[in-house]
């Protein structure tokens, strides 16, 4: 038998865990530069649930994000954020998941990655880029 190179594909079901601090980290990264190319402002809906705006989502609140070039606006909720995170991971966005604990490692989430998570959350796809 020859030494031939073959490739095999396996299908995986992946579960990732995300803690409040992880959501806060991703939201902070997004709001401080990740989404600023297309989003001019973010405002909490109702009562502010944390000390900072980026803490709103993980605590069950929502943020209204305002388009940089039009009057369009979108509401980001925890459910949308989690859906966006899942879509981003499924689409190959570079998010590291610890094999033992299942928690995501936010130290790898830069502005571009955070931006993609938020765009998947709001639009279900990557628009604006």
Task: For the regions a language model picked out, list residue spans one by one.
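Long, contiguous N-terminal structural blocks used for assembly/anchoring
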Residues: 1-68
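Short, surface-exposed beta-strand/loop "edge" segments at domain boundaries and coil↔beta transitions
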Residues: 66-80, 128
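A short, flexible low-complexity segment enriched in Lys/Arg and Gly/Pro that occurs
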Residues: 95-110
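Short, compact, well-ordered microdomains
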Residues: 106-128
